[in-house]
Amino acid sequence: MSSLSEYALRMSRLSARLFSEVARPTDSKSMKVVKLFSEQPLAKRKETYDWYPNHNTYFALMGILRSVGLYRDEHQDFKDEQLRLKKLRGKVKPRKGEGKRAAKKK
């Protein structure tokens, strides 16, 4: 006489699949693989994605502080100065519809 009926075996396999357990008995080597796949991926672990600060937030905050005058970003100051000098020399890109080809048509 068998210990479990066909129905009981099917139900136990189904419940194992539903609750992320191993459906059939497996050896220790296979269980090691199952354990590895059941762990959360490295990129989804909190200690991984909380390692670096949220750059978008910090960038926006530093921009606000810079505009108020509480933070000095020398690299951005340099880029702004270069753009200002470029405008003075007339070397800025023309706006749409004001380029060489548009000037020819007029």
Curated annotation (Swiss-Prot):
Comp. bias (Basic and acidic residues): 95-106
Repeat listed as a keyword = no
| Residues where N-acetylserine is found | 2
InterPro entries named among the record's database cross-references:
Ribosomal_mS33
Q: Which residues fall in a compositionally biased region of kind Basic residues?
A: 85-94
Region Disordered: what ranges? 85-106
Q: What is its main location?
A: mitochondrion
Source organism, top-level taxon: Eukaryota
Summarize subunit and interaction data from the UniProt record for this chain: Component of the mitochondrial ribosome small subunit (28S) which comprises a 12S rRNA and about 30 distinct proteins.
Tell me which family the UniProt entry assigns to this protein.
Answer: Belongs to the mitochondrion-specific ribosomal protein mS33 family.
What is the protein's name according to its record? Answer: Small ribosomal subunit protein mS33
Source species: Bos taurus
